[in-house]
Design a protein with these regions (language model features):
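Short loop/turn segments that flank or connect secondary-structure elements
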Residues: 1-164
Length: 164
């Protein structure tokens, strides 16, 4: 059985270390090590050996993905729905003009913290918390923001800090 994750504990830790994390990531941007992508991938893999997303699902409960047209088309097809019907049932346009869920938590998140559309989930969900992307220093603002929601993102930055 998966052990539940204390989301609030990680949120508080991320708040306490936000200034330190910003500094670490800013230094990476100024002078990224040649092997940064390799180090980041190793840390990402290690963190996700420790953190089981299904014991948390905080991203699914509190953050809504930005739906791209390809996401909408793929998911509507999965449900055998016409695009306008899918959008009318699940999506709205936010103040930035992005298509997002009408309400949170994610309507496709089950009580067991599993995604009912996992194989066709939006790209933003597949890539979250973006800690395995190349040139991680290009998304410092997003990485810092994600540490406040995602225990794995917090641990990623902590381990990155310790390795560099």
């Amino acid at each position: 059985m998966t052990q539940e994750i204390d989301i609030e504990k990680y949120h508080q830790l991320a708040l306490q270390k936000q200034k330190e994390h910003r500094k670490v990531l800013a230094n990476l941007k100024k002078k990224p090590p040649k092997n940064l992508d390799k180090i980041a991938q190793e840390i990402h893999d290690e963190v996700f050996q420790e953190i089981d997303c299904t014991a948390c699902a905080n991203c699914c409960k509190t953050l809504g993905p930005d739906f791209k047209e390809a996401d909408i088309t793929r998911i509507a097809k999965y449900f055998k729905m016409k695009l306008p019907a899918f959008e009318a049932e699940f999506l709205q346009v936010d103040e930035d003009g992005d298509k997002v869920f009408k309400s949170m938590p994610c309507p496709f998140l089950g009580g067991d913290n599993l995604c009912s559309i996992y194989d066709v989930r939006p790209k933003a969900c597949r890539e979250f918390p973006h800690t395995d992307r190349k040139k991680i220093y290009q998304i410092n603002h997003l990485t810092i923001k994600n540490t406040l929601t995602c225990p794995a993102a917090y641990l990623f930055v902590e381990q990155l800090k310790d390795r560099l």
